Amino acid sequence: MSTETAEIQLKKPKEGLFSKKNRKLITDPLDDSNPVTVQVLGICAALAITVQVEQAVVMSMSVLFVLMGGNLIISLLRNVIPNRIRIIVQLVVVAALVIIVNEVLKAYLPDVSTKLSVFVGLIITNCIIMGRLEAFALGNKPWPSVLDGFGNSMGYAWILIVVAVFREFFGSGTLYGFKILEPLGLYDLGYMNNNMMILPPMALITVGIIIWVQRARNTKLIEAN
């Protein structure tokens, strides 16, 4: 076998930016490996900030920025970060990104920033963020790491937004602050807002219903007893 033939055989086709493997990094967290309903991470935010859709959307976009940015930075630095201080480096990177998010919210969305309160700062300790940095970004190239961050952020986001839609609609009769039930005249017919939907336990129950529906549809997610 000639040297040229051997070199040709050793060459592998270049993987596309959105190859099947890379697409799975986006699609899997939306369902089969959802960070909230399957891995049971980030539950605190689902309980605390899903009273209104606006808060859920802003928190979701904040996590998207932090996770994608953190994954990218850690992946770029993965070969130069000493193993013994990797957690510290990850925390510094995430903290810097969270500070940026917090300042932007204070400048452009002060009302939402006040409502979210300390929960934006607590993104630093979000298990989804630290888990993806440690489990994926440290061992993979920048592009897959960015896709992983995007996929897990979207998996986190759709759960928060769905929970917020149910809680705000049935608890306040609004969606994203716009009155929905009042123009329909339902209050005149005797309908009353369900104030229980505003309470944190209802967020947990709503997440539980989503988990039940998800596992009823996808039986492979059911844990073996």
What annotation goes with each model-predicted range?
Residues 53-69, 89, 113-124:
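Structural signature of hydrophobic alpha-helical transmembrane segments
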Residues 81-94, 115-121, 148:
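Cytoplasmic-side transmembrane-helix entry/capping segments in multi-pass membrane proteins
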Residues 176-196:
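Short, membrane-exposed interhelical loops at transmembrane-helix boundaries
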